[in-house]
């Protein structure tokens, strides 16, 4: 299975707990306010706790210079509107609760009534302080166990959060703590001329557990970058300036001495740009030629102002955070990406960019960001770890609680999975996917075709695409409609291979869309077009009911007016309308209109579109093949569960919306044909987001999946692997008790009734928040599919664990790995067992199975599809009928209608 074993370094600096560590106690804080209509917040709970400590010191006769309050480590909540509920201390207050009545001054302003007589609209300031009385109760919960990694991780996070500034749950380094002058310059070449440009290194800290050790991770500060081309930035109409507008920028991103566009860090060193007259060119040549004067003037203007550079280095670091966008530009999908600001180039210019970014004054420049390779990151992270060790203030705080960590990154053995092979046709011909092949599209000749499965509404098997339709707005003219119809038909037939004869030409339907912008995005014309489609089908099948005609429609391709930012509402309406009728749809934006008519689509867009259409119609574009000696290659059912939570209702920030659970299972040997289920979940106090499922729901999901698998294979599977997403370390025990144990009991009963031995059941939790970065010691890039085994003593309680990155290397930057935890194994196999390695191989292989991407994605494709299913049903379909109950939607469950 593995090709080689290498030694890699990871940005993980282990901590040790000193033998002389003093015991640490965790306390619960309960505050009951007697003032009516008063909501306790973070700041006021902190004041109440301070008054409690003063009274406790008086009762015990403590020295005011050594007050109890200064020995506390407060666990501040993530929201300022929530009160403090927990803190830690080395002072033992006893096993009995301690209660004091306190009085403090609150700075909360009363709510403005406004708009009527006696209101407070004119009194902007309001009262300065309000006296509040409260009953404060402190209860000792437990004594922290130094051998409990989770307890120590919690305590260490709180310690570091008190030492440094907190931001979004991560730990930002305080200004002035790290000496920026040592690594603040970097020499770059711009058009053959050398300039010293200022780079600002910024880091953030987090903690993690690995190999049974608690460790500190030093990560680069990251931000999301807006998808905006250089041409748009320099030529946009700025209009009125925002009061917090940014002064400065010619935005350029640097990587290895070359200039890149921020928004389009793509694979390879070339880009096709309309500004380059459609020809291929590398980034450095293109920008040097196009913006040579601006780069030179910007760099020189900065270098002439030494005082300005020095003042920037002494100030707080500032990051340009803009709204991320996603669009398709000349066949290349442009996505917002996380890039570290540890290497930030500052180029001053006299242009103004009114992005409306808060907390940035007009005398500060904007920042262009770049990627950093793992070895460069580890070098800077290790240097920073040395700075932490030399800091007396930090070491004094950590030493008091018995912590000490090393400044050397952890080295460990790294294994590599071989890339899988793809089955491309009915003869199971195998083609190897190489990392640098640019995908398998160019090698795609045939595919397995459409499987004979019962997914039609009338209960009869439907093979191929005998009846499908293409709906085009009438203003796009006949030539466009006929060309689109011809190209879609030819491309889909080429995908179908041996089953191409089953793909008929689509019925062409014109949509009477109003060309006025305000009436263009209405659903009514598309409903009328659907009635026209039924009329056409009725001419082919006279005396047939509409319900039977609808059941014959395999798929409808709907062309909707662009641009994308205006068509979102129409897209949702189209999806809801057709999904309720049990019809799969594929939406396509209209092309841009020019003087010569509509511009034609890029070939890559049409290729991807036809891949989606073919998959939604029931076909498999490709299937990653497991080796025959892998036990999971036969009689295996893969399942995946994910829960999506929509955004909170606008105007109701405290309302928790209903969550949506999406469940995907496979029933065929290639793992490409799926069966989907969905259920809406109402949140509650103990399960606010709905991440933990009810016992009956998991039983229902598995029961239906086993029935589908048994109907297709005439037997139950020998192995069931369930991938689970959205489960944190603290929820694993709850998931085992609530979901898995009852599920295992049900499967045991089901297999006994079928006179079959119990299947091999495995439940794997995938955690995407793993922030570790690895680099090979030999200064070589780690190949895709690399993984490490986490041999940890506490895995006896939490399951075996491995960390894997299946994606390819881009620009020398190691992809973010995924942490997989095997939380339930009916066979209780060891991590050194061959079956466990085969499970790892299965996980890596399934990352190549997603139809919308020719290379590996970060997760197994069924887990990614479960996420898409739950997100689609929650955000598009809304709280409608569940897939378990609706007969109309039942026909879609065997097709990936949600991709």
Swiss-Prot record:
PAZ domain is absent, but Ago is capable of binding small RNAs in the same way as the other Argonaute proteins. It comes from Giardia intestinalis (strain ATCC 50581 / GS clone H7) (Giardia lamblia). Residues 107-129 are annotated as: Disordered. It is found in: Cytoplasm. Plays an essential role in growth and, with Dicer, also involved in microRNA (miRNA)-mediated translational repression. The RNA interference pathway is implicated in antigenic variation having a role in regulation of variant-specific surface protein (VSP)-coding gene expression. Several VSP genes are transcribed but only transcripts encoding the VSP to be expressed accumulate. Antisense RNAs corresponding to the silenced VSP genes are detected. Residues 116-125 have a biased composition (Gly residues). Belongs to the argonaute family. Ago subfamily. Interacts with miR2. Highly specific binding to the mRNA m7G-cap. May be a component of the RNA-induced silencing complex (RISC), a sequence-specific, multicomponent nuclease that destroys or silences messenger RNAs homologous to the silencing trigger. It holds the Pfam family Piwi. GO terms for molecular function: RNA binding. Residues 229-313 form the PAZ domain. The keyword RNA-binding applies. The keyword Membrane does not apply. Its main location: cytoplasm. This is Protein argonaute. Residues 555-878 form the Piwi domain. GO terms for cellular component: cytoplasm. PROSITE patterns: PAZ, PIWI. Gene3D superfamilies: 3.40.50.2300, paz domain, Ribonuclease H-like superfamily/Ribonuclease H. One of its GO terms (biological process) is regulation of translation. Keywords: Cytoplasm, Developmental protein, Differentiation, RNA-binding, RNA-mediated gene silencing, Translation regulation. SMART domains: Piwi.
């Amino acid at each position: 299975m593995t090709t080689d074993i290498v030694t890699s370094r990871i940005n993980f600096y282990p901590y040790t707990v000193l033998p002389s560590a003093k015991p640490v106690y965790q306390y619960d804080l309960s505050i009951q306010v007697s003032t009516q209509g008063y909501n306790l917040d973070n700041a006021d709970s902190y004041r109440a706790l301070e008054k409690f400590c003063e009274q406790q010191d008086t009762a015990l006769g403590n020295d005011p210079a050594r007050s109890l309050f200064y020995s506390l480590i407060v666990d501040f909540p993530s929201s300022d509107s929530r009160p403090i509920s927990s803190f830690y201390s080395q002072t033992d207050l006893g096993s009995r609760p301690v209660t004091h009545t306190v009085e403090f001054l609150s700075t909360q302003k009363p709510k403005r009534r406004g708009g009527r007589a006696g209101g407070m609209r004119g009194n902007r300031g309001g009262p300065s302080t309000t006296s509040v009385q409260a009953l404060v109760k402190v209860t000792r919960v437990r004594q922290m166990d130094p051998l409990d990694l989770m307890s120590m991780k919690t305590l260490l996070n709180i310690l570091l959060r008190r030492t440094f500034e907190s931001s979004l749950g991560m730990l930002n380094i305080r200004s002035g703590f790290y000496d920026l002058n040592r690594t603040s310059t970097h020499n770059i070449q711009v058009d053959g001329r050398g300039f010293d440009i200022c780079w600002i290194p910024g880091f953030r800290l987090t903690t993690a557990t690995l190999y049974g050790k608690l460790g500190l991770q030093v990560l680069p500060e990251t931000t999301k970058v807006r998808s905006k081309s250089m041409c748009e930035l320099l030529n946009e109409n700025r209009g009125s300036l925002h009061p917090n507008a940014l002064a400065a920028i010619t935005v350029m991103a640097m990587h290895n001495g070359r200039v890149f566009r921020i928004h389009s860090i793509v694979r390879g060193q070339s880009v096709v740009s309309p500004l380059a007259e459609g020809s291929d060119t590398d980034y450095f040549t293109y920008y040097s030629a196009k913006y040579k004067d601006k780069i030179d003037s910007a760099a020189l203007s900065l270098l002439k102002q030494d005082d300005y550079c020095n003042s920037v280095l002494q100030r707080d670091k500032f990051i340009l955070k803009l709204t991320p966008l996603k669009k398709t530009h000349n066949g290349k999908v442009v996505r917002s990406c996380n890039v570290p600001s540890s290497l930030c180039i500052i180029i001053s210019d006299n242009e103004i960019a009114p992005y409306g970014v808060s907390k940035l004054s007009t005398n500060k420049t904007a920042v262009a960001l770049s990627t950093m390779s793992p070895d460069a990151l580890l070098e800077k992270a290790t240097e920073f770890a040395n700075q932490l060790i030399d800091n007396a203030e930090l070491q004094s705080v950590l030493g008091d609680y018995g912590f000490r960590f090393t400044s050397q990154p952890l080295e460990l053995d790294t294994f590599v999975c071989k890339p899988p092979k793809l089955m491309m046709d009915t003869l199971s011909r195998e083609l190897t996917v190489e990392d640098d092949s640019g995908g398998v599209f160019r090698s795609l000749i045939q595919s397995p075709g459409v499987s004979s499965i019962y997914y039609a509404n009338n209960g009869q098997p439907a093979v191929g695409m005998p009846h499908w339709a293409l709906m085009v707005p009438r203003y796009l003219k006949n030539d466009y409609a006929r060309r689109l119809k011809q190209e879609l038909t030819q491309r889909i037939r080429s995908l179908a291979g041996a089953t191409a004869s089953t793909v008929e030409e689509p019925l062409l339907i014109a949509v009477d869309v109003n060309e006025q912008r305000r009436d263009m995005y209405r659903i009514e014309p598309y409903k009328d077009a659907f009635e026209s489609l039924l009329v056409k089908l009725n001419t082919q099948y006279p005396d047939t009911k509409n319900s039977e005609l609808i059941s014959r429609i395999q798929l409808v391709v709907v062309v909707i007016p662009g641009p994308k930012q205006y068509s979102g509402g129409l897209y949702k309406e189209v999806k809801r309308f057709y999904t309720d009728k049990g019809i799969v749809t594929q939406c396509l934006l209209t092309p841009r209109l020019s003087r010569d008519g509509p511009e034609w689509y890029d070939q890559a867009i049409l290729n991807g579109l036809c891949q989606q259409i073919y998959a939604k119609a029931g076909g498999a574009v490709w299937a990653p093949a497991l080796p025959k000696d892998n036990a999971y290659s036969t009689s295996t059912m893969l399942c995946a569960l994910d829960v999506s939570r929509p955004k909170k209702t606008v105007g109701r920030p405290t309302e928790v919306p209903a969550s949506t659970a999406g469940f995907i299972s496979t029933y065929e040997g290639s793992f490409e044909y799926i069966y989907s289920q969905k259920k809406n979940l109402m949140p509650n106090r103990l399960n606010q987001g709905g991440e933990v499922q009810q016992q009956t729901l998991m039983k229902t999901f598995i029961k239906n999946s086993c029935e589908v698998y048994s109907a297709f294979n005439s037997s139950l599977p020998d192995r069931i692997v369930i991938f689970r997403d959205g489960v944190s370390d603290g929820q694993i025990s709850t998931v085992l008790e609530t979901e898995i144990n009852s599920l295992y009991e049900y499967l045991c009963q089901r297999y006994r009734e079928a006179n079959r031995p119990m299947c091999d059941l495995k439940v794997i939790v995938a955690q995407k928040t793993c922030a570790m970065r690895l680099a090979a010691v030999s200064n070589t890039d780690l190949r895709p599919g690399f993984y490490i085994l986490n041999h940890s003593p506490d895995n006896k309680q939490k399951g075996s664990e491995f960390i894997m990155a299946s994606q390819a290397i881009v620009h020398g930057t190691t992809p973010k790995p995924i942490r997989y935890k095997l939380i339930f194994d009916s066979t209780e196999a060891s991590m050194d067992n061959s079956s466990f390695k085969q499970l790892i191989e299965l996980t890596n292989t399934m990352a190549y199975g997603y139809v919308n991407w020719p290379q590996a994605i970060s997760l197994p494709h069924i887990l990614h599809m479960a996420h898409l299913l739950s997100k689609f049903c929650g955000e598009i379909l809304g709280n409608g009928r569940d897939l378990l109950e609706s007969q109309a939607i039942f026909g879609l469950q065997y097709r990936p209608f949600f991709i």
